[in-house]
A protein has these predicted regions:
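H-loop/switch region of ABC-family ATPase nucleotide-binding domains
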Residues: 96-97
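Conserved ABC ATPase signature
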Residues: 35-39, 43
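Conserved catalytic motifs of ABC-family nucleotide-binding domains
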Residues: 56
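Helix N-cap at the start of a conserved alpha-helix in ABC-type nucleotide-binding domains
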Residues: 71-73
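Conserved ABC ATPase "signature" region
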Residues: 10-31
Length: 150
């Protein structure tokens, strides 16, 4: 299918079947006939993931997927990203500024400061000193779970 076909709504039956299948897998089938403006921020993020999955990617780039989402919606989106990665064997690069989410959902963290990598390793190896280096702030000024860490 070309981009022009998509603009004019000329989708094949196979495209429609795949879209419905992915919508069901992501828990969005009930919103099939809703306009985008009627969806919550978390639902919109999930729709974005569905749209990406329709392209059958080998890599999924997620730039701040939970920014501006409430905690419950953020959890749903992060769980979906992890599920998509595991079930479809798709590598996911997720850019997050929420330390708590990175620690909870990611197996590997690449922390950068000033355009340079200051940490690249497993989540379990990330120390408070490394977090301070990544954010260039003492732990007492950083928040996790709505509370200062230190």
């Amino acid at each position: 299918m070309s981009a022009l076909d998509g603009v004019f709504g000329r989708y094949t039956e196979e495209d429609k079947r795949r879209a419905l299948s992915i919508l069901e897998q992501t828990g969005l089938r009930d919103f099939l006939y809703h306009r985008a403006g009627e969806l919550s921020g978390g639902q919109r993020q999930r729709v974005g993931i569905v749209r990406a999955l329709m392209q059958e990617p080998s890599l999924l780039l997620c730039d701040e997927p939970i920014a501006s989402l409430d905690p419950a919606s953020a959890q749903v989106v992060m769980e979906l990203i992890c599920e998509v990665s595991a079930k479809r064997n798709i590598a996911c690069i997720v850019n997050l500024h929420q330390i708590e989410a990175a620690l909870k959902y990611m197996g590997r963290i690449i922390g950068m400061y000033g355009g340079r990598i200051v940490y690249d390793g497993p989540t379990s190896g990330l120390t408070e000193a490394m977090i301070e280096k990544i954010y260039n702030k003492p732990m007492s000024q950083l928040m996790i779970g709505g509370e200062a860490i230190a």
